[in-house]
Curated annotation (Swiss-Prot):
Its EC number is 7.-.-.-. The complex is composed of six subunits: RnfA, RnfB, RnfC, RnfD, RnfE and RnfG. This is Ion-translocating oxidoreductase complex subunit D. The modification FMN phosphoryl threonine is found at residue 186. Its main location: membrane. One of its GO terms (cellular component) is plasma membrane. It is a multi-pass membrane protein. One of its GO terms (biological process) is transmembrane transport. It comes from Aeromonas hydrophila subsp. hydrophila (strain ATCC 7966 / DSM 30187 / BCRC 13018 / CCUG 14551 / JCM 1027 / KCTC 2358 / NCIMB 9240 / NCTC 8049). Part of a membrane-bound complex that couples electron transfer with translocation of ions across the membrane.
Length: 350
């Protein structure tokens, strides 16, 4: 006897909660590398973002008359909080993180209808809101621990986040200094600043912060997220097309740029292993709600992000570009899906 049932006939055994937990678990290698090189601030930011995201989610659901507990347990708000905490500078003032996280949940997610309805990636909406509103604080990263002038423990990190000063009274401006007395910035920011001052890329990359493929600490952070991304691919949580297209197009664009203008462009490997490249390619751009859903569309979507990342890094006003690239690509998803929709078997071409 055959059972008669309605579609769908193929099912994914992984529920939403399981998928979200797997993605959070895959963030662990990158998070550990980030914490090793940049201190306890990232952990504090993630915890604060979790409290804010879950509280905002519960508040909006209560106002909308929707069940609160199932939505809090599905893991979507928690994942958004984790991605926000990982994306922001470790010692960003607490109220900025709360503002960005609440905006991500209330506006970027629930204004469009809630889970599965948002047009834009909520974590990246929060990031861009804060970057445009508070550019100085959003580009204030600590130097890697190996070249930092001050040792920042958990208490110091918490004190700076909530009061603006360490336990010893040092300000954020002082804590940003390296052992050579120079104020540190991310490798991408240092490169952008040096090029605007008329230096060549080779001259800029003699700076202390440049070491390895993507700069001190950043190479390991990106390797950590690459490892987590490969885990997601192995678990079939994400599709290979989006990260593959992003990394491939970014590598190709960076290679062409480096061959044509080597004095004004960093090496292709630098673009792959600096900034938010691996976090963006495997964890942010692959958001199943705001990303393209067709096989060819995912390739187009990924290529668009990769090219935009390089163009904005090279010619734009912001050192890293993943948030802008992802949001611009999100905007194009309806058109991409419409143009790349698979042909129905047996249908005639018009």
């Amino acid at each position: 006897m055959f059972n008669i049932a309605s579609a769908p006939f193929a099912h994914n055994r992984k529920q939403t909660q399981t998928l979200m937990l797997l993605v959070i678990l895959a963030c662990l290698p990158g998070f550990l590398a980030q914490s090793w090189f940049f201190g306890w601030g990232t952990l504090i930011q993630i915890l604060l973002a979790l409290v804010t995201a879950l509280g905002s989610e519960a508040l909006v659901l209560r106002l909308r008359g929707r069940p609160v507990k199932p939505a809090l347990l599905d893991g979507s708000a928690a994942l958004t909080a984790v991605l926000i905490g990982l994306s922001l500078p470790p010692l960003l003032p607490w109220w900025m993180l709360v503002l960005g996280t609440a905006f991500a949940i209330i506006i970027a997610k629930h204004l469009y209808g809630g889970l599965g309805q948002n047009l834009f990636n909520p974590a990246m909406v929060a990031y861009v809101l804060l970057l445009v509103s508070f550019p100085v604080q959003m580009t204030s990263w600590l130097p890697p621990s190996s070249i930092a002038a001050y040792d920042i423990g958990f208490g110091d990190a918490a004190s700076v986040i909530f009061t603006g000063f360490s336990l010893d009274g040092y300000s954020m401006a002082q804590l940003k200094q390296g052992v050579d007395g120079l104020t540190m910035a991310t490798p991408l920011d240092t490169l952008k600043t040096g090029l605007t001052q008329g230096l060549t890329a080779g001259e800029v990359m003699t700076h202390t912060v440049f070491e390895g493929w993507g700069g001190i600490g950043w190479s390991w952070v990106n390797l950590g997220y690459l490892l987590g991304g490969l885990f997601l691919l192995q678990q079939k949580v994400i599709n290979w097309r989006i990260p593959g297209a992003i990394l491939g197009s970014l590598l190709l664009a960076a290679t062409l740029g480096y061959l044509m203008t080597p004095d004004a462009t960093a090496t292709p490997m630098f673009h792959l292993f600096s900034g938010a490249t691996m976090l963006g390619a495997f964890f942010i751009a692959t958001d199943p709600v705001s990303a393209s859903t067709t096989p060819r569309g995912r390739l187009v979507y990924g290529v668009l992000i990769g090219v935009l990342v390089y163009v904005i890094r090279r010619f734009g006003g912001y050192p890293d570009a993943f948030a802008f690239a992802v949001l611009l690509a999100n905007l194009c998803v309806p058109l991409i899906d419409s143009l790349t929709r698979p042909k129905v078997y047996g249908a005639r071409r018009k």
